[in-house]
Amino acid sequence: NFKLVIVGDGGTGKTTFVKRHLTGEFEKKYEPTIGVEVHPLDFFTNCGKIRFYCWDTAGQEKFGGLRDGYYIHGQCAIIMFDVTARLTYKNVPTWHRDLCRVCENIPIVLCGNKVDVKNRQVKAKQVTFHRKKNLQYYEISAKSNYNFEKPFLYLARKLAGDPNLHFVESPALAPPEVQIDLAAQQQHEAELAAAASQPLPDDDDDAFD
């Protein structure tokens, strides 16, 4: 069992993402002391069951930062931004700093959500923060279930210390609410891979000029 904290600006799709996992949604518990919903997300691996206790902020981040109680004892994390809203990516370093102040040296996945939406403001090749901080990055679409399992598989492998760990069955997910243009998305992922071999820009802002 691992405590997984999910952070990022309000409206980036954190709650939508967590709710895709149907048994976790069914068994969630509200923790009134810190105002979070905790979803137990089970994944079945070749090494047995792994449960992530997923802490969802329930929108408190709209009123400023999150209290330390949210982060304490976090064993892994997802930082989420919305590829259709540039500001949510610009705020990723702040979320990362807040997280690392309380949780040192935990595996972190950066997720760019809503890649099903046509007019992206944050292009795949503009996402460089994960390279500076040695995080894993995935493009996801919560509403279409695209890449839903990827962040959890990465974190499970890191936490288990086993790069060969794999899921042996898929969790029950809510049916897709939107369709994703897979050909276009594969093009974005190819751009992302190509960008990874380029030197990092000196300044984050120049990617958006």
Swiss-Prot record:
Keywords: GTP-binding, Nucleotide-binding, Nucleus, Protein transport, Transport. Residues 59-75 are annotated as: Switch-II. Residues 28-36 are annotated as: Switch-I. Residues 1-162 form the Small GTPase Ran-type domain. Signal peptide: none annotated. It holds the Pfam family Ras. Residues 187-200 have a biased composition (Low complexity). GTP binds at residues 9-16, 59, 113-116, 141-143. One of its GO terms (molecular function) is GTP binding. GTP-binding protein involved in nucleocytoplasmic transport. Required for the import of protein into the nucleus and also for RNA export. Involved in chromatin condensation and control of cell cycle. NCBIfam families: small_GTP. Belongs to the small GTPase superfamily. Ran family. This is GTP-binding nuclear protein Ran1B. It comes from Lotus japonicus (Lotus corniculatus var. japonicus).
